[in-house]
Design a protein with these regions (language model features):
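N-terminal type II signal-anchor transmembrane helix
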Residues: 1-50
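Soluble, non-transmembrane domains of envelope/secretory-pathway proteins that act on or interact
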Residues: 7, 245-261, 519-780
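Conserved catalytic neighborhood of penicillin-recognizing serine enzymes
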Residues: 107-134, 261-274, 370-425, 468, ...
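Active-site SXXK
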Residues: 81-83, 87, 235, 292, ...
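A penicillin-recognizing enzyme superfamily signal
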Residues: 282-305, 313-317, 328-331, 336-345, ...
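A short, well-structured edge-of-sheet supersecondary motif
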Residues: 44-57, 74, 306-338, 432, ...
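Short, well-structured active-site flanking segments
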Residues: 91-100, 173-176, 339-342, 365-383, ...
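Non-catalytic, structured segments within soluble enzyme domains
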Residues: 25-26, 113, 117-294, 329, ...
Length: 780
């Protein structure tokens, strides 16, 4: 179309007016504050692995892939190539190139081929303000806005904004997004052929689409290659040294379409996207992530006949006071709606079952309640209205603390938890970052067995403190996060070390022997078989595995040691086989921890009568250590009558002096212990030993607890005392009121009639006595 001379004159007049006003407005515009050009369009978020490999690129709010990249982070050839191809006079014109504009008008006036006159700034104005530049008014507005932009922003900012908003085909805008979408690399790492390719696409993004493999794209790809060849010819003339790249530029270039963008570690990226934006380089190790995903998927497929359909896993690397996320699997299949696959097992609140027991023992170590070989009682016990049972329904009698932990015995754990104070287990969890806890009274001692809920991330952080010397580490999932040091101390270094040592003796489920290299691990099974857990500390890593259903459907197969532990060790073995988690358990050796020989049967310092000793860790000045009184010498004359001491023709034998309830447990287990013949003149045995274990001790109700009962349907309180083997009966009193008589080692039920404080007194038939203060609260 040819323009008439009057039309040309009017257009030139308008252009001169725009140029004049633009020049006059420069001073004013420069003095005004302005918003960054990066804020004119919504941005995508790119989440990458620690290696820089893209995990996920989100769409911006307007449905475009757009990722802002500073000009300094682009290869220097890219802006230079774009200016060479699009706007050689960019640094000289004020936003509108009068020479190019006049030439374009002349060519249009004489009816020749249309010649572009848009500068980089004009193209930026069109992109920013969505202008229709096909009609003269739109074109005039574009030029006015270009002058305005030049007046307000530097050439650096304008060029940077153009490269971040330029069209690259489909819904891809800007160099940052185009480099990730098409070439799977950050803009800073673009090769010379890739730079030359991206430099020519914005001029005609429809005709110069990157080859994506579809049958109709060949012609479009040819148009792109021709444009790139023209640019390269100009480039080599301008930069002769780059002629060495000519073969690479001439070679076919491969690119992926947006449909093939990665969608890796979806639960992990979902979690990051809630708080992060822009370019986010995470701490995720893609090799470890893929290994964990592969093993987990294969395990679920193999166990599907048991109804095991879903699982999650979290791998943390502990060091420098932080727990760094290395692998993160929120479900067996993110896209499977049948298992609610988009629910995140790492952040979901679930019952941990017995997985909190190591911290009960850790607190007890710090509070001087036990050492690993302290003998605990695994026997029927009522803690007020709470009467825990073991998973197998059986009781083992006397058991060492470390064995009770490894075998996950419930009654000893609850008994130890009942003795904790400042902090209690509840206070430990509260300070340890477990969120949404109800009141301590709501849980009571059931918290020790999984009565509360934790997330996998929260539980992993607690186990990570065992590797961090007892200090609670921060969870780190973004590489740029400043490492936090000096986290709150929840356990001592000594306690953390000993707990890991105890857990490392837990035998693998497949071999029946402790793992080598060492793995300190624990399982958990929630009530109703809703959750199966397994947690391991190995090398400098913490690995957590959960199996269950998000709809809370129970399954008898959901047992920690049977369902979760095999998956746990398959992952550990695979990581070690690939060299991704090699090495023995990394533990700090506190100088104040020592080894000591104790009597194997009692856990106390061995007296001369103790037949067998074992070595254990203890914390000097804190661990309870006393001389054992379990084994004692008993003397017999030639006629096999008991005598009270050594003498001519007197032999000595060693007897174990267990309390009455323990003797009963041994009998019920089919392992009765022999008891020495009674002789009132000889007391309870001869030194070494003494008679402490023969004294009467009230063991139920517990000291310091408030017993709350329903007034209409109260449950009887269990009254029980430990007595010596020679005791036959125990008599119970509430104040001066007689309650009843119980055989030695047996429980007497008692129903208080009103709320208040009671003084309970137990007296045995040999004169032994003990008292216990008790508070009872009857509620409607």
């Amino acid at each position: 179309m040819r323009l008439s001379r009057p039309a040309i004159r009017r257009l030139l007049g308008s252009l001169l007016t725009i140029l004049l006003l633009g020049t006059l407005g420069v001073g004013l515009a420069r003095s005004l504050s302005h918003v960054p050009l990066s804020s004119f369009a919504p941005q995508s978020t790119a989440v990458s692995a620690q290696s820089g490999e893209l995990l996920r690129l989100t769409l911006a709010a307007d449905g475009q892939y757009r990722l802002w990249v500073d000009l300094e982070r682009m290869p220097s050839r890219l802006p230079a190539a774009v200016l060479l191809y699009e706007d050689r006079w960019f640094y000289l014109h004020p936003g509108v190139n009068p020479v190019a504009l006049a030439r374009a008008m002349f060519e249009a006036g004489v009816g020749r081929r249309r010649v572009g006159a848009s500068t980089i700034t004009m193209q930026l104005a069109r992109r920013m303000y969505r202008l229709n530049t096909r009609d003269p008014r739109g074109k005039l507005r574009q030029m006015a806005l270009a002058l305005w932009l030049e007046a307000r922003y530097s050439k650096h900012d304008i060029l940077e904004a153009y490269l971040n908003l330029a069209p690259y085909g489909r819904n891809v805008e800007g160099v940052g997004a185009a480099s990730l979408v098409y070439f799977a690399t950050p803009a800073a790492h673009l090769s010379v052929p890739q730079v030359m390719t991206l430099a020519v696409i914005p001029q005609n993004p429809r005709e110069r689409r990157l080859r994506s493999g579809d049958a109709n794209s060949r012609k479009l790809a040819d148009g792109l290659e021709e444009a790139r060849a023209r640019l390269w010819a100009r480039w080599v003339k301008a930069v002769p040294d780059d002629a060495r790249f000519s073969a690479a530029v001439a070679a076919p270039i491969s690119a992926r379409p947006p449909e093939q963008l990665p969608f890796a570690a979806p639960h992990f990226t979902d979690a990051l996207l809630r708080s992060a934006a822009g370019e986010v380089q995470s701490t995720l190790d893609l090799a470890r992530q893929r290994t964990v995903e592969r093993i987990l998927t294969k395990y679920i497929e193999g166990e599907s006949q048991l109804g095991i359909r879903n699982a999650g896993a979290l791998l943390l690397e502990v060091g420098g006071g932080v727990a760094t996320v290395r692998a993160y699997v929120g479900s067996a299949d993110y896209r499977d709606a049948r298992i609610d696959g988009q629910v995140n097992a790492v952040t979901a609140k679930r019952s941990p079952g017995s997985a909190l027991k190591p911290f009960i023992y850790g607190l007890a170590l710090d509070q001087g309640l036990l050492h690993p070989r302290t003998i605990l009682k695994d026997a029927p016990t009522a803690f007020g209205p709470f009467s825990p049972e073991n998973f197998d329904g059986r009781f083992m009698g006397p058991i060492a603390a470390e064995d009770a932990l490894i075998r996950s015995r419930n009654v000893p754990a609850v008994a130890v938890a009942s003795q904790l104070s400042r902090p209690t287990l509840y206070e430990f969890l509260q300070v340890g970052g477990v969120s949404r806890l109800k009141s301590e009274r709501h849980y009571g001692l059931a918290l020790a067995l999984g009565g509360g809920e934790v997330s996998m991330e929260e539980l992993g952080r607690l186990y990570a403190l065992l590797l961090n010397g007892g200090r609670l580490p921060a969870i780190r999932s973004i590489l740029s996060q400043e490492p936090m040091t000096g986290g709150v101390r929840l356990l001592s270094e000594e306690s953390s070390f000993i707990v890991l040592d105890m857990l490392s003796k837990n035998p693998r489920p497949d071999t029946g022997a402790p793992a080598s290299p060492a793995v300190a691990w624990k399982t958990g099974t929630s009530w109703g078989f809703h959750d199966a857990w397994s947690v391991a500390v190995f090398g400098r890593y913490v690995l957590l595995v959960w199996i269950g259903n998000f709809d809370n459907t129970g399954n008898p197969a959901f047992v920690g040691v049977q369902a979760a532990a095999p998956l746990l060790f398959r992952i550990i073995d695979a990581l070690r086989a690939q060299g991704l988690a090699a090495g023995d358990l990394v533990r700090r050796f506190p100088a104040s921890v020592a080894r000591i020989e104790v009597c194997a049967a009692s856990g106390d310092l061995p007296n001369p009568a103790c037949p067998q000793t074992v070595s254990t860790w203890y914390i000097p000045g804190k661990s309870p250590i006393r001389l054992s009184t379990l084994h004692r010498y008993v003397y017999f004359d030639a006629a096999n009558h008991r005598v009270c001491g050594p003498g001519p023709e007197v032999r000595q034998e060693v007897y174990e002096f267990w309390t009455s309830d323990m003797l009963r447990l041994f009998r019920e287990a089919g392992m009765p212990r022999r008891t020495p013949p009674a002789d009132p003149d000889c007391g309870n045995g001869s030194e070494p030993g003494g008679s402490d274990s023969e004294a009467l001790h009230i063991v139920s109700p517990l000291r310091g607890l408030v017993y709350t009962e329903r007034a209409l349907h109260p449950a009887p309180l269990a009254l029980r005392a430990d007595v010596g083997a020679a005791t036959h009966a125990v008599y119970w009193f509430a104040g001066n009121a007689f309650i009843g008589r119980a055989p030695a080692g047996e429980t007497l039920p008692w129903l208080p009639q009103q709320s208040g404080r009671y003084t309970l007194r137990a007296v045995d038939d040999r004169g032994g006595a003990d008292t216990r203060e008790l508070e009872v609260e009857l509620v409607p």
